Swiss-Prot record:
Protein name in UniProt: Cytochrome b6-f complex subunit 8
One GO location term (cellular component): plasma membrane-derived thylakoid membrane
InterPro entries in UniProt: Cytochr_b6-f_cplx_su8_sf, Cytochrome_b6-f_cplx_su8
Compartments (UniProt record): Cellular thylakoid membrane
Leader sequence residues: none
Gene: petN
SUPFAM superfamilies tied to this protein: PetN subunit of the cytochrome b6f complex
Amino acid sequence: MDILTLGWVSVLTLFTYSIAMVVWGRHGM
């Protein structure tokens, strides 16, 4: 795995996590 792939994985993980936090927050969990 090169640095570019690692960068994309970290960005997508952070993005998905932030989306999940927003969705869960709106549902009052």
